[in-house]
């Protein structure tokens, strides 16, 4: 889905991802 792709792009820009490509902190988009 596009939402998942957008989250991945957001995480790449911010640089805050875990090994699953998800946000690694509660204050970030998940």
From Swiss-Prot:
Summary of the function given for this chain in its UniProt record: May play a role in the development of hepatic metastases from colorectal cancers.
The protein's organism comes out as Rattus norvegicus
Print the keywords alphabetically: Cell membrane, Membrane
| Name of protein | 80 kDa carcinoembryonic antigen-binding protein
Q: Where in the cell does this protein reside?
A: Cell membrane
- The domain of life is Eukaryota
Q: How does it assemble?
A: Binds to carcinoembryonic antigen (CEA).
Identify the main location. membrane
- How is this chain modified after translation? The N-terminus is blocked.
What GO terms fall under cellular component here? MKS complex; plasma membrane
Lineage of the species this protein comes from = Eukaryota, Metazoa, Chordata, Craniata, Vertebrata
